[in-house]
Each structure stands twice: as C-alpha cells, then as structure tokens.
Amino acid sequence: MQLRDIPYMFGYTKIIKVDDKLLRGNAIFMLTKIARLKAKNVTQVIDLRDGGKAGYPFLKRLEKFYCKLFNIKYVEAKMQFVQDKIPNQDYFSKVTSLIENNDGKSYIHCHYGKHRTGQVIAMYEKAKNVDERKIIKDLFAYGWNQKSDFVENSYKSLLAFLKKYFPAQKNLKLAEMERKRLV
C-alpha cells in the first residue's frame, strides 16, 4: 500500500454522478462506502478490477460481502489496465448493457476509479451520443488529472484508447497538452 491509497481505503473519496443511472468512484473497501451507495439507491456494483493489485482476492471477497449485506448486485467485468490490452467494442457494449438493463442505479469502479473506470464511462457516454468534448473533458477531469497519471503505462494506455475510440487529432493534442501541464 502507498500513501496515496489511504483516502481510497477509508472511503474519503467522492461518489460522482455520471447520469441518472450511473455513479462512479473507487473500489469499495469500507462498509461506510457501501452504505453511502445504498443511500443513493444503487442496486448494482460493477467491478472492473482484474486482480493486479496486492490483496485483491481479499478485497473482492469483502466487497462482495458488503454488497450481499446491503442487497446490492455485484458484477465483475474485469478489464486489464495495460497499454496493449485496450478492450474491444464488444467488451464496452457488454458493460453498457449491464448499466442500461439494471432497473436501478449502477456504481462502477476499478481500483482508484480513474483510468479503467474513465474509459468505460467514455464508451458508455459515446453509446448514449453524449458530446465528445464533454466525454474527453471528463476523461481528464476524473482520470488523468495528476502527474502520476502520466507515467509511461498510464499515458500509453490513454493514447491507445484515444487512438482506437476517439481518434480525432484534437483529442490527441489535448492529451499531450494535459501531460505537459502536469509533468
């Protein structure tokens, strides 16, 4: 665990509203977080983690237990976070279907709720015809917004994602401007 993990571990992070059906944030480590989600009428949690973080099996069991305790459906939609493993359109369509077919609100997260979560939300919003400028703006505002987000793997993953799904040159230029601003 690193110092930057402390706010995530103890639930001191925001739960961000994407739209009326979807909320986003980080993994659920504490009972207080799942209680906050229940209070926001969340009926489904979508976990994007692929098991790469230390302690993941225990944390996954804990999160599943919390969901069961609060009668919230827990769904795994594993997504690797590496530059050469950008999911195909089918993956994003399946996650979008999970959200759209849920009768209540869904909460989606990876470990920190930034990169993988941001990419899935970008594709969810793209499927809903949200303005591309807003999608890209949110991708940076909630995902790649700190110097540490632009280390090699994170930045290469972002570029690969943008080139594949949002290939307009202006989006790639914006990514480079954000990187220069923070690095």
Give each language-model segment a name.
Residues 1-107, 112, 119-183:
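Cys-dependent protein tyrosine phosphatase-like superfamily
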